[in-house]
């Protein structure tokens, strides 16, 4: 789940959380005439599945086509979206999906699990299984903030459409249709936890390909798994690392900094994030570590000064990081991240 502000996240969800295509020097889109996804070729038989905006897909996925089967990273935000990916993937390969990896428990990455039948192994960290099995992916302030608010978002869009000029109204009506379909799809979700769990590491050997699943420590959640292809030098990170500031509402901020340090020794050139464009190199690790340290320092100072979470969320200022994150044009952060920081500071979350 990506971060910064609730408004930006809601707009991203309404628009299908669609990321731009990777630069031509990195990859090129495959002509598949799909509606929900662009499959961006990263290397031979490795694709970044990026939403087109025609559906609310929630997150990016990764597709690894092996000798006899396919591994998909993350099942997306609803069974409708998972079905769309499965069907549209047939334009890339006739091989069956055999494995789905849940990078973490958040609804936008794991609520398509029910689409995959008994012939598909869903793999995740033991924390991820526990969270989904207990119903945590469908409750709490994170889910309430982004899914629970959908009816209100739809009502607001309809009000805007009614008062808008014809050209703008047409665009709004299209967004309304996408968001209403997404809301209906969320009502059909029956969370299915991973059928195979891991603690620290698991390796799959599929033909000549080595696929490493790694838990390097707590970060965005308590069970973030990255998928590493050492031969191809590709790393799928879920929401552990991306090109933009991530969502902190279920995070372990200080652990996250340490976990990111564990990424640095890995051999990879290309990162496939759960949100945003694919990118090259490791520089963004340092950028995100600096942001997290600054956020934590300011949150602790606000807490120790007796500032309430909502006021602190308005006052925390991360604009010094705008050189790496241009969207940081004003002070203020998502209040869920501050609430989470206060819980960690007070020992309510361990």
Question: What is each model feature region?
Answer:
Residues 2, 304-350:
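C-terminal regulatory/interaction regions
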Residues 2-16:
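Bacterial N-terminal signal peptides that target proteins for export
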Residues 40-90, 225-239:
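Conserved beta-strand hairpin/beta-sheet module of binuclear metal-dependent hydrolase folds
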Residues 41, 173, 187-229:
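Core dinuclear metal-dependent hydrolase active-site scaffold
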Residues 81, 87-194, 203, 297:
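Active-site HxH/HxHxD metal-binding segment of metal-dependent hydrolases
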Residues 257-307, 311:
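Divalent-metal (often Zn2+) His-rich catalytic cores of metallo-beta-lactamase-fold enzymes
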């Amino acid at each position: 789940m990506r971060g910064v502000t609730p408004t930006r996240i809601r707009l991203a969800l309404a628009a299908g959380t669609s990321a731009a295509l990777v630069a031509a020097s990195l990859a090129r889109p495959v002509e598949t005439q799909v509606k929900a996804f662009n499959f961006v070729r990263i290397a031979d038989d490795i694709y970044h599945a990026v939403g087109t905006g025609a559906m609310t897909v929630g997150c990016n996925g990764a597709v690894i086509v092996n000798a006899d089967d396919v591994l998909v990273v993350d099942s997306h935000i609803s069974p409708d979206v998972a079905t769309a990916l499965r069907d549209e993937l047939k334009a890339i390969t006739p091989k069956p999906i055999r494995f789905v990896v849940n990078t973490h428990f958040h609804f936008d990455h794991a609520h398509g699990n029910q689409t995959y039948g008994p012939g598909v192994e869903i793999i995740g960290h033991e924390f991820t299984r526990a969270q989904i099995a207990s119903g945590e992916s469908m409750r709490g302030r994170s889910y309430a903030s982004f899914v629970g608010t959908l009816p209100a978002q739809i009502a607001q869009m309809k009000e805007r459409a009614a008062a808008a000029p014809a050209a703008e109204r047409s665009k709004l009506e299209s967004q309304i249709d996408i968001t209403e379909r997404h809301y209906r799809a969320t009502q059909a979700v029956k969370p299915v936890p991973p059928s195979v769990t891991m603690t620290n590491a698991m390796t799959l050997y599929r033909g000549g390909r080595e696929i490493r699943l790694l838990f390097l420590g707590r970060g965005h959640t308590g069970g973030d798994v990255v998928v590493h292809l050492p031969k191809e030098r590709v790393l799928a990170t879920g929401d552990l690392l991306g090109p933009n500031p991530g969502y902190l509402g279920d995070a372990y901020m200080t652990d996250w900094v340490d976990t990111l340090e564990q990424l640095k020794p890995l051999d990879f050139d290309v990162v496939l994030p759960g949100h945003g464009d694919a990118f090259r190199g490791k520089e963004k690790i340092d950028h995100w570590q600096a942001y997290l340290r600054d956020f934590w320092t300011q949150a602790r100072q606000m807490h120790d000064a007796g500032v309430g979470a909502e006021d602190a969320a308005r006052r925390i200022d991360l604009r010094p990081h705008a050189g790496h994150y241009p969207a940081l044009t004003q002070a203020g952060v998502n209040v869920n991240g501050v609430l989470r920081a206060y819980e960690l500071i007070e020992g309510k979350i361990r």
